[in-house]
Amino acid sequence: MAKSGDKIDLSNIKGFKVDKHSTGGVGDKTSLVVAPLAAACGVKVAKISGRGLGHTGGTVDKLESIPGYKTQLPIDTFEDIVNDVGVSIIGQSANVVPVDKKLYAIRDVTATVDSLPLIATSIMSKKLAAADDGIVLEVTIGSGSFNKTFDAGEKLARIMVDIGNAAGKKTVAVLTDMNQPLGRTIGNSLEVVEAIELLKTGKGDSRLLELVLALTSAMLSLAGMGDINSCKELAIKKLKTGEAFKKFCDMVSRHEGDVSFLRDTSKFYLGVTKEVLAPKEGYIAKIDTEGYGLASLYLGAGRNTMEDKIDFSAGIEVVKTVGEYVHKGDVIAILHSTNKDLFAQSEQKVLESIQIGDILIEPNPVVLGYVQ
């Protein structure tokens, strides 16, 4: 499958080249932070990303919410940026693994869309079409993922890691919890703003920061830069010094994006807003994360088909999440959209997706394990 279309030859890029891929989630803006952070630590990140579909978001859409950012570049320009800056994120061209689209059409009519081996080959054929030296896979598990159970996620991770290693790529999978939205935002501009603030300050939502450091340290360790703990310490240092934010600014500039939006995130248009209020008092015991993803889709933040247009301002601020206490009438979420007529359906979906109870339930750890 990897040989069915264009191969992406990265041999002109000097140094260890590593890619990071997520199987999809809600609020998953890790690539926006991990890619420049890993580059600031010394590895080359040549990342080819996809668009969002259904309730999950895509890195390409998020980057395109930065005015001017070009996600389609000639490969030689892509290589030049990686050599000069250390990181570049582009979109996948139509002729990379074209047979995958044909195979997916067959899966769609043969009830094999959920087949783990076929999911694994679809993902890994695209990764193997590029000449990276290492691959870090973020395999999400839970209500906001396509992998609803730990067993399914672990099996998928094992298949993909085995494929990568057999092809001569250093490959590791990080199993992550998606039983609540990742971070405090869902949607394109909203997630970019949250990622920028983390890059600027080294501070943010604790689960998002923990996962960013886990993924980055896995990338550095694959590159032979030390064990996980020493690599994590290096990543923390590069966040605190602002070097990772500078890498992000340099990358956006080379992609012709407007860097002034990164320096002053108030320039992002975030639509009109509506607060969603807690219907009763208690602890947030559970969130149907897919429901939150669909609620953001209803606001215009995603697409049902690849031809749909996206409202970059649309999305949800997650004000309260699992394990937090609310009083009746407290704000639990803030909806964003350019079209206020979309609020009613989205608000209803958010309220349907949240359970409030009397007992404090601790959320799952965000990192569930590793497969190597």
Sequence positions of predicted segments:
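General beta-strand structural signal in soluble alpha/beta enzymes
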Residues: 45-49, 71-74, 89-92, 136-139, ...
